Amino acid sequence: MGGSNMVVVESLNKVCREGELEHNYSYRMTKGKISLSGYENPIELQSYGIEIERQDIVKGDIINIERDFVKDISCQRYKVHKLLRLLYDNSVSPIHLIDIIGEYIDKYIEDFDNQLKEIAIN
């Protein structure tokens, strides 16, 4: 595995309160590269992913942090942005990330194939 350095390209934040408990949510779109081998020369495509972090805070102290991410969801930034908004608008917790976006991931995997076909044609 090469150094997969992901860069955060968009971040949406919100705070939800339940009595004394405060949840700080961060929804981030990450950008990286996916390397596809099996060709004469390995092909690198731009890819976008999502990371969600939730900090649970009581009286200013962080008592718990949950985080999960999925990289390489699609090479189409707008699709991942829409997913990010969906998660943000519904205050989705990191622990539910995979449940919510699993079916999208299965669909969007085709984007990489389509991108490869375009490269092959040109």
Predicted regions and their residues:
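Negatively charged, low-complexity tracts enriched in Asp/Glu with abundant Ser/Thr
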Residues: M1-S37
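Residues embedded in well-ordered secondary-structure elements
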Residues: E18, Y39-N41, F69
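A positively charged, amphipathic N-terminal helix/segment that binds anionic biomolecules
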Residues: Y25-P42, L84, P94, I98-D99, ...
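Generic "edge-of-domain/loop-turn" microfeature
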Residues: I34-L36, I57-K59, Y78
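A short, exposed loop/beta-hairpin motif centered on an aromatic-Gly-Thr core
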Residues: I62-R77, K82-D89
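C-terminal charged interaction modules
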Residues: R85, D89-N122
